[in-house]
Amino acid sequence: MDYYDVLGVSKTASPEEIKKSYRKLAVKYHPDKNPGDAEAEKRFKEVSEAYEVLSDPQKRESYDRYGKDGPFAGAGGFGGAGMSNMEDALRTFMGAFGGELGGSGSFFEGLFGGLGEAFGMRGDPAGARQGASKKVHITLTFEEAARGVKKELLVSGYKTCETCSGSGASSKQGIKCCDRCKGSGQVVQSRGFFSMASTCPECGGEGRMITDPCSSCRGQGRIKDKRSVHVQIPAGVDSGMRLKMEGYGDAGQNGAPAGDLYVFIDVEAHPVFERRGDDLILELPIGFVDAALGMKKEVPTLLKEGACRLTVPEGIQSGTILKIKNQGFPNVHGRGRGDLLVRVSVETPQNLSEEQKELLRKFAATEKAENFPKKRSFLDKIKGFFSDLTV
């Protein structure tokens, strides 16, 4: 049996071409699509055996040089007496589709009606599991968010057991390969028309058995822990932002990496400033006399000097925004600062005395149309509707 002929590819075929051809043939001859068909079962085992060799660079090189009896073949050649064990053939099948069997709309869901998990794709077959990621929320003052700050967080979780270095055993001799699943962490069972892969009940999917557990972690390889973590919050962060600290989550198991720590930011509101992106908005109320005559005004800022001198031009209208450049929030990516936007609010006087009212009446008697251009423009527009209105 020539493995290249079995898969229908040339001897110069790329790994992608070999995998593509195997997938097509494996699906075609899969026992769940051909129940009771002995010939299809035989072909399924053959293409699985061929793929198991040609998908491995070392085995393929040895096969190309020496044939089926190469040094990487093991006793009886690459396939021995052929891949007669359906469990091995199905395991090869699972490996070929391993990256695509999770989530809705996956290959297997379309082909076998959502049985991806039934074919055993439930994580690393060797039992190595990355540690869980953790998340914490931190609240900053407006000023801390503006200048950046270093914070100390207390994080609860799991750390690698120092006694056994994460192995879970008191010594190397205290670990053995699981006899039931042969280290794969899964067992395959035939149920009616389906070949179902499930977590090995003996080892719980670990692929190994601990015969002499570590006394500190009781065979878990991890222990509960509370630790202080220092996190540098960059200047310019805003509510809803998230910082990722790789490797600061729970310790992994069986040599897998630790999870990550996600720090979610909340920024308190400020009594004076409102933030819009990297810009700050300051509401500045002024009297109508200052609005008419203009003025110079000290306005607060978030920078070290604490205040900035602002010129309010005469005749300014309520709602006008005056910009002070580079006095806003720092950009979180280091691209400068925003601006301080001062929104002027002209306040109409209230609770006037009779003397003040009389002065205003005298002022009104001196008003001219050019003193109120918007009013004049409005009256000009409606003059045709109300002929009795005059400027």
From Swiss-Prot:
Subcellular location field: Cytoplasm
ZnF (CR-type) intervals: 148-226
SMART domains, A to Z: DnaJ
Swiss-Prot/TrEMBL CXXCXGXG motif repeat ranges: 161-168, 178-185, 200-207, 214-221
Alphabetized PROSITE patterns for the sequence: DNAJ_1 (PS00636), DNAJ_2 (PS50076), ZF_CR (PS51188)
Binding-site positions, Zn(2+) 2: 178, 181, 200, 203
Complex formation: Homodimer.
Protein name, as recorded: Chaperone protein DnaJ
Originating species: Chlamydia abortus (strain DSM 27085 / S26/3)
Gene expressing this chain: dnaJ
